[in-house]
Amino acid sequence: MNEFKPKVALIMRNDEMIEKFNLKRVTIDTSFGPVDRCFEGYVYNVPVLVIYGRFNGQKVPSNEINFQQTIEAIKNRGVTKVIGTFVVGGINPKMPQGSVYVLGDLIGMSGYNIKWDRNISFHNAEMYEPFCPQLTKKLCDAASKMDFPVKTDATYVTFYGWPRIETKGELKFYNKMGWDVVG
């Protein structure tokens, strides 16, 4: 049995970090099958679990990713704090390409995942405050020390993203609404 107890899960792919901190590859069993693109170890003395967002080498559209499997894998390791890094499209014209955003809110325009298995452990997610205030504060504090553009309290708008990406008109609308990033 694995005695390592991660405090934070990072949903990301950063092979350089995995190598730098000598994170150990692990397989996490779930009711959906094993998740084998997971890594555990210490990053600056914090015990972390790194799990690829598109694990197991999947090359599928976002709507075919089994998010339930990711959630279950994280839960099975006892982690309650999750940080995700994602590639998104910038809407805010004041922020240059390559900017970093710390999200403060989100707008859901992508509908519902009809493949979600409603026969298991159903509960609604509380989304009034969608991001952890303590983690957000830590990210903002760290961001204030960076020498590149960081927008804190950014608004993220979800978009299905498959089989198409946003139209010019949709992006203009999102910008007029004051939203910062889309994905």
Question: What is each stretch, according to the model?
Answer:
Residues 79, 105-108, 140-148, 179:
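Generic secondary-structure signature for well-ordered alpha-helical cores
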Residues 129, 180-183:
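Catalytic beta/alpha-barrel core
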Residues 32, 65, 134, 164-166, ...:
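Residue-level recognition of alpha-helix initiation/capping sites
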Residues 129-176:
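Active-site rim beta-loop-alpha module in soluble metabolic enzymes
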Residues 66, 81, 150-152, 181:
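Residue-level detector of short coil/turn "hinge" positions at structural boundaries
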Residues 1-127:
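Metabolite-binding pocket within alpha/beta catalytic cores that recognizes anionic/polar moieties
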